[in-house]
Amino acid sequence: LFDKDPSLELFMQYSKNPFRKFNKRELFGIGARFNIKENLKAGVGLMNEKEEDLLAVTDNTLRITSYVHNEFIIEENIIFDLSVFLQPGIDSFSDYKATLIGQFDFHINDSFKISLQYNTFYDSRPPSNAVKKEEGFATVFSYNFN
């Protein structure tokens, strides 16, 4: 079923975003990654999330975290990446976060890449005054010095 044995993942995140109506978000997690096919990966794990809104109200949530990531090679220098994340709370599955990220990568040469990204984020119980769903577009220019 899998190309390789599952691998262990450890991850952490610290972010601040007053535009999304939260002061900070901290998370730490552990999980397993499965290589289903060469370009298809999935993961599942547990994470502890701590959020603080702009009024300094904090919320700690233990969540299941899961994702699927697929990479589609369109041309030799054009790749489409698709990632989907689902993170329900362990105490209440109706408290969940879901994220979808789609990205075209245009490799100009071995060092330079232009990426066009679309993302959407849904939080069933967002911090006070925040919206439940957000969407965004981004253009990213990357240069690899190696």
Can you annotate each of these PLM segments?
Residues L1, Y14, F34-I36, L40, ...:
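Residue-level signature of outer-membrane beta-barrel architecture
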Residues K24-F28, T58-I64, S94-A98, K133-F137:
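Residues that define the transmembrane beta-barrel architecture of outer-membrane proteins
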